[in-house]
Amino acid sequence: MAVSWRSWLANEGVKHLCLFIWLSMNVLLFWKTFLLYNQGPEYHYLHQMLGLGLCLSRASASVLNLNCSLILLPMCRTLLAYLRGSQKVPSRRTRRLLDKSRTFHITCGVTICIFSGVHVAAHLVNALNFSVNYSEDFVELNAARYRDEDPRKLLFTTVPGLTGVCMVVVLFLMITASTYAIRVSNYDIFWYTHNLFFVFYMLLTLHVSGGLLKYQTNLDTHPPGCISLNRTSSQNISLPEYFSEHFHEPFPEGFSKPEEFTQNTFVKICMEEPRFQANFPQTWLWISGPLCLYCAERLYRYIRSNKPVTIISVISHPSDVMEIRMVKENFKARPGQYITLHCPSVSALENHPFTLTMCPTETKATFGVHLKIVGDWTERFRDLLLPPSSQDSEILPFIQSRNYPKLYIDGPFGSPFEESLNYEVSLCVAGGIGVTPFASILNTLLDDWKPYKLRRLYFIWVCRDIQSFRWFADLLCMLHNKFWQENRPDYVNIQLYLSQTDGIQKIIGEKYHALNSRLFIGRPRWKLLFDEIAKYNRGKTVGVFCCGPNSLSKTLHKLSNQINSYGTRFEYNKESFS
């Protein structure tokens, strides 16, 4: 099927434009710095000593400076949530670009890893060249103390060398702990190692303070490559006759007077010895702004989250899912947002993100989250909240005398699903536990749907286990009945796809009778579904929202970009829970 350029531009255009701008900045900065150290007269003698290693080390350092500053901006999540919710970003296309913050953070991280490798390799060559090409003429320019000094001493006895080695170790730990396998199997390792970025930035500011690389300051009196008369006489070097010949005044008419340091048209004579000075550290100029912004946000988030919530109830659902309902004074959130949970009794430092499945409203202050019990943290958290005897039961009623552990929340933070209520037509597709981001949206519609732009919602939930359906079966039934009573049966189109057939009638036949006709066995036929939605919403823009496995996401993303004969445009939005 052909790609719709209209849909492609809506889904990919701004993203690729920003990627092009970012790439251009990196290429321009790399090339400009490379040329400066390769051809700049102030680095003439240093380039003679170090060669290509100097150019590559400095060019890669400039790219590292840029990306070490940019990588912090996507992590200012409170700022991004404010921009999304305020009128500062009125364009929906621009707001959707904020959803790529995590991808941009990863892209900058990968770039830092690649150019760190280039930077390290170039400086290893520089350390060798400092030793081999020790300059007897310009001793001030040397980093080595004598010719053929062991290059390893430069790596482990100088500030730039030692901090560089430490940064490589920190970066290696952060890279390996950021892989998908470790994030899923042991999130604790990812969390602890990622917080080493504070150490990384401290080392980075120290790294540039060593002053090993120097530039020439007196280019006007000592042009690079000039001949020093003092050096030639002290070394018993005689200049050729035409070198020692002086111009006589007055100069012939039509000829300009040569520069003071010029003796003839063939050679320039130095007026003084070259003077060198260490480069002014520029890294702090790059990172100070974003780092201060991030630290200010972390401080604000710490103050905002230092008061524990009040747990109202804990509900145990089938398939290892737990629901927590709580209240907190002055807490406000929008449907689709998420929060982070911090329980000191489980871990003193760990915070874990969970999508809000119930948001506070004007009439009720209760909000809640659903947790899938996967990993050490959620298992320990469940054991604290639920006694072993009640973990298999459906509901644990709230008991006033029960002592729950202290629980702190941070947020709310923005997500792509906030836009689902801003389309006239939205298609929400969930895979398994990926249904949680849509629960708050469904709860909001159940409370009051009229203030929002949304007029038709297609809700598709693909699940392997019939027990998982019970997480939100009551909510779906109430929503279905509400719109039938208000004579709006076409407002919400619910389709549930389950692969397990055993016991379906037993579980949903009586209690959830309204959903019987909404239940299908197998997987959705996505192409037919998109064609049907396009047909019934001709010429409209449909927001597509997906939270589930990557295979599901890729399928919907591809279909959203394909052309259709009804003039319908699909704008794709994705949330990942891994």
Curated annotation (Swiss-Prot):
Glycosylation sites: N133, N230
Short name of one Pfam family: Ferric_reduct
Enzymatic reactions: NADPH + 2 O2 = 2 superoxide + NADP(+) + H(+); NADPH + O2 + H(+) = H2O2 + NADP(+)
Domain FAD-binding FR-type residue range list: 304-419
PROSITE patterns, sorted: FAD_FR (PS51384)
PTM comment text: N-glycosylation is required for the function.
Regulation: Activated by insulin. Inhibited by diphenylene iodonium. Inhibited by plumbagin. Activated by phorbol 12-myristate 13-acetate (PMA).
Positions of transmembrane segments: 17-37, 63-83, 104-124, 155-175, 189-209, 425-445
InterPro entries: Cyt_b245_heavy_chain (IPR000778), FAD-bd_8 (IPR013112), FAD-bd_FR_type (IPR017927), Fe3_Rdtase_TM_dom (IPR013130), Fe_red_NAD-bd_6 (IPR013121), FNR_nucleotide-bd (IPR039261), RBOH/FRE (IPR050369), Riboflavin_synthase-like_b-brl (IPR017938)
Alphabetic keyword roster: Cell junction, Cell membrane, Cytoplasm, Disulfide bond, Endoplasmic reticulum, Glycoprotein, Membrane, NADP, Nucleus, Oxidoreductase, Transmembrane, Transmembrane helix
Gene Ontology molecular function terms on file: heme binding; modified amino acid binding; NAD(P)H oxidase H2O2-forming activity; NADPH oxidase H202-forming activity; protein tyrosine kinase binding; superoxide-generating NAD(P)H oxidase activity; superoxide-generating NADPH oxidase activity
Functional description taken from the UniProt entry: NADPH oxidase that catalyzes predominantly the reduction of oxygen to H2O2. Can also catalyze to a smaller extent, the reduction of oxygen to superoxide. May function as an oxygen sensor regulating the KCNK3/TASK-1 potassium channel and HIF1A activity. May regulate insulin signaling cascade. May play a role in apoptosis, bone resorption and lipolysaccharide-mediated activation of NFKB. May produce superoxide in the nucleus and play a role in regulating gene expression upon cell stimulation.
Subunit architecture: Interacts with, relocalizes and stabilizes CYBA/p22phox. Interacts with TLR4. Interacts with protein disulfide isomerase. Interacts with PPP1R15A. Interacts with LRRC8A; this interaction prevents the ubiquitin-mediated degradation of LRRC8A.
Name of the protein this chain belongs to: NADPH oxidase 4
Source organism (scientific name): Pongo abelii
